[in-house]
C-alpha cells in the first residue's frame, strides 16, 4: 500500500518505507504470461520445428531459457479472441490427422499442429502452470466438459482414455479455467449480452464444478468499470448451496478484467496504467457489493481479480491481424513498470495478472530465425519478477504531480499522477525492495528517503531518451547495477525505473 501527499514543485520530495507494516501477501501469479494462437506467438515463437534453435519437440530452446529468467508462474492459453472458434479436439492426436481450420479472430489459418498436449509439454519444460480459456463463442458445454475430462480425468472414461491413448497416462490437473474471453466485444464471434452471459456462465460453472470441484473458474468481465462487470458479478457470485446452486464450493473464484494502455506522448503513456489501478478499486467494490446484496457469508472465499490481459499496446500502430509486433521504447518500459507497481500496490485484490503476450505479439521477447531480442519492456518485468515478491508494505510518498493530459482523459480526475510512482515489498528472504519510476522526461528528482538500512543495492532501467529502443540492432535500454549507502536523499534519474534493495533490520 502506497499513500501519497501532493507537494508543490518547490517543496522537497520524500519517500518513507515501513518494512514492519505488512499490508497484504503478493500472489506470485501477478507475474503470469499469456500465449495465444495469434501472429508469431505460437508458430515461429515458442514452436518452430525445423529451426536449428529448436529441440526435438519443436520448441525454441532460446525462448524457453530466456523465459525461465522471468520465473513465470502461470501461462494463459490458447486465447484470447482466438478461443471463440477454437475446438480443442482438433489439436490432439496424430499430427497428420489434425485438420486445418479458418481462424476468424486474426484472419489466418490454424493448422492445429500445436495443441493441448504440446502446450502442456512446453509448460512442464518452462516450469509453469497452465490456465485454459473455454470457447464461449462456437463451443458447447459438452465440449468444455470433455476438455476438462481429457486434461484432468483419472477414471476409465472416454476422454481420459483418449489422453492416455495420445501418450499421457497421468492427468494434467489443470486448475485455472476461464469462462470465455471478451464475449461482450463486438469483434467477437457470437458476441453476447450481459444477461445471456451471466446465465450461461453460471450454468456452465455448475456443471464444471460437478465434474471437478477443484477447478478455479474465472468469470469474463470487461474493464472493471462497466455495467457488464456489475451485472455478471451480481448474478454469478452467490452463496454456496443457494437455491440456484447444487455445488458444495463457490462456483466463481475470480473475475477477469482487461485493459491496454498507450499514447504517442510520453507522460500520458506512463500515467495511463493508473487507469488500471482505479479499475481494480472499482472491481473490488463491485465484488463486495455482489457479496453484500446476495447475502454471501464471510465464511465463503471472496473472489479475487484476474487481470489476464494487460500491456502497452496501440492496435493502430501494431495491428492485431498483422501480428501485433510492437517495437517498444523506454517510455513503454516505464509504463510497464507503473503497471507492475499497480499490481503490487493492489496485491490484496489481484490474484493473477497476465501480460499479453509472452513471445512476439506485443511482447517483451522477440524471435528471429537466428536468435532472440529482449525489448525495453523485458527489463522491468525481469526486475519485478525477481525481487518484488513477498508482502506489500506500507510506503508514503510526498512529491509533485504531473498536471497535463492523460490517456484516458479521466485518469487525472480520479487518481493522483505523481512524478515518482512507487511500490514496496518485503520478501521472504527478509529484504526490502522499493520500485520507483521517475516519469519526468527532463528532470532528475532528489528525494529524502526514510527506512533504508545498511548498503543498498541499486538496479536502474534507463536509456538516453524516452524513445530509446532495443529493436534497432543494439540494446539501448537495459539494467545497470550500483550501490548506495542508504543515507539522506537519493536522486532518481529522469525517465528511469530504480529498484532499491536492502536487508531489513
UniProtKB/Swiss-Prot annotation:
It is an enzyme of class 3 (hydrolase). Glycans are attached at residues 152, 269, 438. One of its GO terms (biological process) is L-arabinose metabolic process. The keyword Hydrolase applies. Its EC number is 3.2.1.55. Belongs to the glycosyl hydrolase 51 family. This is Probable alpha-L-arabinofuranosidase C.
Amino acid at each position: 500500500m502506497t499513500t501519497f501527499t501532493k507537494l508543490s514543485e518547490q517543496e522537497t520530495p520524500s519517500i518513507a518505507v515501513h518494512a514492519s507494516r505488512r499490508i497484504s501477501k503478493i500472489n506470485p501469479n501477478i507475474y503470469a504470461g499469456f500465449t495465444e494462437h495469434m501472429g508469431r506467438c505460437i508458430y515461429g515463437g515458442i514452436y518452430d520445428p525445423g529451426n536449428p534453435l529448436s529441440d526435438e519437440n519443436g520448441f525454441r530452446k532460446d525462448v524457453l531459457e530466456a523465459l525461465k529468467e522471468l520465473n513465470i508462474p502461470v501461462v494463459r492459453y490458447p486465447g484470447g479472441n482466438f478461443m471463440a472458434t477454437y475446438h480443442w479436439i482438433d489439436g490432439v492426436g496424430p499430427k497428420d490427422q489434425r485438420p486445418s481450420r479458418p481462424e476468424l479472430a486474426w484472419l489466418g489459418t490454424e493448422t492445429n499442429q500445436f495443441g493441448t498436449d504440446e502446450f502442456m509439454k512446453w509448460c512442464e519444460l518452462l516450469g509453469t502452470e497452465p490456465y485454459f480459456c473455454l470457447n464461449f463463442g462456437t463451443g458447447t458445454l459438452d465440449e468444455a466438459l470433455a476438455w476438462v475430462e481429457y486434461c484432468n480425468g483419472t477414471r476409465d472414461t472416454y476422454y481420459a482414455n483418449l489422453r492416455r491413448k495420445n501418450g499421457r497416462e497421468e492427468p494434467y490437473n489443470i486448475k485455472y479455467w476461464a469462462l470465455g474471453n471478451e464475449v461482450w466485444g463486438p469483434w467477437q464471434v457470437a458476441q453476447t449480452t450481459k444477461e445471456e452471459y451471466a446465465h450461461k456462465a453460471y450454468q456452465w460453472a455448475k456443471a464444471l464444478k460437478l465434474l471437478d470441484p477443484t477447478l478455479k473458474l474465472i468469470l469474463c468481465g470487461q474493464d472493471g468499470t462497466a455495467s457488464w462487470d456489475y451485472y455478471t458479478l451480481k448474478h454469478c457470485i452467490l452463496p454456496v448451496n443457494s437455491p440456484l446452486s447444487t455445488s458444495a464450493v463457490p462456483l466463481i473464484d475470480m473475475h477477469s478484467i482487461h485493459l491496454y494502455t498507450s499514447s504517442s506522448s510520453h507522460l500520458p503513456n506512463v500515467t495511463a496504467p493508473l487507469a488500471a489501478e482505479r479499475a481494480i478499486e472499482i472491481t473490488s467494490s463491485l465484488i463486495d457489493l455482489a457479496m453484500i446484496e446476495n447475502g454471501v457469508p464471510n465464511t465463503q472465499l471472496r473472489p479475487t481479480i484476474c487481470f489476464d490481459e494487460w500491456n502497452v499496446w496501440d492496435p493502430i500502430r501494431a495491428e492485431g491481424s498483422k501480428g501485433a509486433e510492437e517495437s517498444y521504447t523506454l517510455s513503454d518500459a516505464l509504463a510497464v513498470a507503473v503497471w507492475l507497481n499497480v499490481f503490487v500496490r493492489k496485491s490484496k485484490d489481484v490474484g493473477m495478472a497476465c501480460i499479453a503476450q509472452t513471445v512476439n505479439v506485443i511482447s517483451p521477447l522477440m524471435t528471429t530465425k537466428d536468435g532472440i531480442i529482449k525489448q525495453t519492456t523485458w527489463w522491468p518485468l525481469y526486475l519485478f519478477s525477481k525481487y518484488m515478491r513477498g508482502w506489500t508494505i506500507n510506503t508514503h510518498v510526498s512529491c509533485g504531480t504531473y498536471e497535463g493530459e492523460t490517456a484516458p482523459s479521466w485518469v487525472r480526475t480520479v487518481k493522483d499522477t505523481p512524478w515518482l510512482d512507487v511500490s514496496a515489498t518485503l520478501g521472504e528472504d527478509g529484504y526490502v525492495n522499493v520500485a520507483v519510476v521517475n516519469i519526468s522526461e527532463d528532470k532528475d528528482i532528489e528525494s529524502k528517503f526514510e527506512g533504508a538500512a545498511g548498503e543498498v543495492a541499486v538496479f536502474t532501467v534507463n536509456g538516453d531518451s524516452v524513445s530509446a529502443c532495443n529493436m534497432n540492432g543494439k540494446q539501448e535500454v537495459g539494467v545497470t547495477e550500483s550501490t548506495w549507502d542508504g543515507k539522506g536523499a537519493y536522486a532518481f534519474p529522469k525517465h528511469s525505473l530504480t529498484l532499491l534493495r536492502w536487508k531489513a533490520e
